[in-house]
């Protein structure tokens, strides 16, 4: 690793690189899931309104559960929260082909939103706990930029 990257990110640069890689992967995952599921629903003949309401399930869960996720993180820890949320999300992805009902997909997406809220809070807590006053702004900027890049890459994967 070059010393310029290490000096820019600080002593914990390897941990930050892992964090940024996770942000990229989660961005790609979300950026792929939203349009892919919408295209599948459209091919099944659902209206744009029905598809839009289905898409709302994930952010709705984030809004409803973001206040309790810190309690879960405190109880089971940062690393476990991240791992459990990601495993839960991956398992939920495999349920889409099993259930064809729009209502079932709403609940699956809602649960993915809950897991996303847990992971989001855990990642943000991890990132902010590592950053100090001298690099916090840089770290948050890189983290969010990498996430958005992943989100932009997602539709290109389809």
Could you tell me what each predicted segment is?
Residues 80-94:
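Structural signature of the two symmetry-related core transmembrane helices
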Residues 77, 98-100:
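Helix-breaking motifs and short loop linkers at transmembrane-helix boundaries and internal kinks
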Residues 65-77:
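Helix-to-loop junctions at the C-terminal end of transmembrane segments
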Residues 59-67, 151-152:
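Residue-level signature of mid-helix packing/kink "hotspots" within the transmembrane helices
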Residues 103-111:
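Paired small-residue
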Residues 55, 59, 140-148:
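Small-residue-rich transmembrane alpha-helices and their cytosolic helix-loop interfaces
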Residues 118-131:
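Intracellular juxtamembrane helix-capping segments at the cytosolic ends
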Residues 11-59:
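Helix-loop boundary and gating motifs at the non-cytosolic
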